Amino acid sequence: MKGVDADTFKKELLKQSIDELGHAEKIARRMIQLGYVPPSTLEEILKFTTCGQLTMPENVTDYESFIEKILRAERCAIAKYNELIKKYRFKDQITYELFEDLLEDEVDDEETWESFLEQYRRRKI
């Protein structure tokens, strides 16, 4: 990623990447508590994801496209966590609360990237 806004985006991506690793650890820990073996490779993880793998735009200075891709990923995660919250609401209180917490983080991330997109579009005009 290069250009005027690269440093701002890099800092936020690093922060959110660390947060996402924390999400993965929490989910893996819960899976183990329930007697499951969590996926351990990227290939295995991608089999379970309904959101797919995020790819960056070919033009590394196309910030608008970059942010829009991140927003699609955040919105997919939000939709998935909402589904899981509904699924576990009356079945498993601990898993339900876990997904509620993760959903809150994803909504915060979405709001951050929406703000970046709005700021970027205003600067572009």
Placement of each model-derived feature along the sequence:
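Iron-associated oxidoreductase/ferritin-like identity signal
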Residues: 1-125
